[in-house]
């Protein structure tokens, strides 16, 4: 009897031990840490301060490179981190950490470093405090060091013997390929989260890819002194002109409009039996990518309106839209897309059958939008956050006899 008890106890002990080991193994598998694999999952590694400099903050670069710094301050790059829309987005529970890697690209700018993903889940990053975090540099978003500092060197395109810091000439690094690392972020992260910035692919598929690059249009050249007291040399503008929609009310960013507008010229008089037709043609004449491009929430509106000139009553109105339409939940999918390809033209028309003799005014307006007003309200972006600008207006008055 005693022997049977001993055997039973041994079996129970063995079963418990095996169960415990298996349980620990399963628990370990359930919390495995997977390494980061894609380049957009990680920040640019920490960059030390090059010899001769006090920091790699843009504000300190601007002490010498004053004109370039003032241009950069007007750019969207300078607002990449502080932009109210972006700040609203990253506060969402559905927003993964990796979005910040294009808005504050250097490890120096990130308060926490991500070393892996728990169970491969982007919503469970393994973080550790960054001992070299620079809070002031974080506020600068995409600054000078993003493109011009690597491994203790200032990266440039020309040899200079006057710089107080080491310079490494690397035109390939400072090519459009650097732009595309962020301006072609295109991935299905989760079923309801799609990153779809395809400007780089649009440029490659367009008519200018073999002869012009991002830099051709967005960093035009001029001869100037790189810093006060130095001789003039070939330089690039650093305000990176784009949509022209300001990030704050009162600001005036440098715009680069890719569209040409060709409105009809109407005769001054018509008979009361005539139907009056007005058209305006929009052509993507200047962009090497589609318009709009970048954020899929951007769009153009074309509003054509006939008014009674005597009392401003609206007699006819048509609204057209150029842009993508997406459904974001429960699965993100593109519903439609009528963005203008490079060199593509599209004509929009409105007709009026005059109700009586009199004077009538045709009003045409084209506006460029960052997002809908509904989206802005959802993100609490009202008041000081402009959501659109007007890029064309025109009026013509006709008399009907």
Specify the residue positions occupied by each region the protein language model found:
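Primarily the internal scaffold of c-type cytochrome electron-transfer domains
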Residues: 32-52, 71-94, 108-111, 115-333, ...
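C-terminal motif of bacterial Sec signal peptides marking the signal peptidase cleavage site
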Residues: 26-28
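Extracellular Ig-like/FN3 beta-sandwich strand-entry sites
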Residues: 275, 345, 357-361
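Bacterial N-terminal signal peptides that target proteins for export
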Residues: 4-16
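A long-range scaffold signal marking pre-active-site subdomains of enzyme folds
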Residues: 58, 66-71
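Short Pro-Gly-centered flexible turn/kink motifs
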Residues: 341-350
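Short, aromatic- and glycine-rich surface loops/edge beta-strands on solvent-exposed regions
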Residues: 304, 359-367
